[in-house]
Amino acid sequence: MIIDLHTHSNASDGTDSPSQLIANAIDAGIDILALTDHDTIAGWQEAEAALVSHPKGASLKLVLGSEISCQDRDGTSIHMLGLLFDPNFEPLMQEMEKTRENRLTRMERIVARLNESGIEITMAEVYSQKRDDATLGRPHLADALVARGHIANRDEAFATYLHNGSKFYINHYSPSPIDAIRLIKAAGGVSIIAHPLASRSGRKVEPEIFTELIEAGLDGIEVNHRDNAEDEKSLLLEIARQHNLVVTGSSDYHGTGKMNRLAEFTTSPEEWERLESRARERRVISK
C-alpha cells in the first residue's frame, strides 16, 4: 500500500490543480493521498469531485487537510500538518484566514525590498503566477522572478533571494505550533509536525521543542522527507518511539514547482492506521 500524506495543489503553491493532483496520484498507483495546501482548504471540493468522477477513482482514498504555517517564540518557521479535521470548526478556519491575509502585506514588503536592490518585479506579476483563490506564497514570487528573467527556476530563486536567511526574507503572522496543534485537535483532527529538522532546506527547530508540542497533543512526526538528513531522521525516529508518536513519510509534492516526486517517501499502513484512529471521526473520502 502506497500512502503519501503531504502534497500541494495550486490552491496554494503547487502547480497541479486539485483535479490534476488526483489524476497524477491515481496514475502513480497511490492508495491513500493527503491534500495539504498551505493555510487553506480551498482545494478540497475540487479534489473530492475529481476523485468521485475519475474512472479509476475507486483505487484512491483521499485525506483532506492543510499545512499550517507556525512560528515559535524565536521566530523559527514551523509547519504543522493538520489532517481529518472538521472544516466547519470556525476558530481553525479564522486562524488560517488571518495567516493568509498577512501573507499579502508580507509579500508587498518583500517585493519592495527586491525593488530597492534593483531587482524589478511587481505585485501584479506575482499575482499572475497563482490562481485567484490560492494562498499567496514565496513560490509565486519565485515564479514571477523566473518569468521576468531574473533567475532560471524556483530552486535558484529560493537559493539566491528567498531563503529564510536572505536579506529579503520577512516573517509573517502565524500561530504558535502549540496553538495550531490545539486548534487541529479541537476540530477533531490529527497533527503532524512537517520536516521538523530539515537542515537541507535551511529550516531547523531545536529538538527540545518537542516536549511542549507533545504536551499540546502532537500526534506524529514527518520523519521521512527529502529535507531531513539521515542523522536527523534517526533522531526524529528515536523521539517518536520514546513518546509513542506516529511516524510518517511524505513527498511534499508541489508538481513542477519542486523536485519532489509523488510518493518518493511514504507512510506505512500500520502507522496510518494508528494516525487515523486518533481522529475524532472517520473523514477519509472514497469513491
What are these regions (language model features)?
Residues 1-77, 162-163, 175-258, 267, ...:
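An N-terminally biased module of ancient metal coordination in phosphate/nucleic-acid-related enzymes
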Residues 50-211, 266-286:
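Extended substrate/RNA-proximal surfaces in nucleic-acid metabolism proteins
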Residues 91, 258-259:
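A short acidic, helix-capping loop that chelates divalent metal ions and anchors anionic groups
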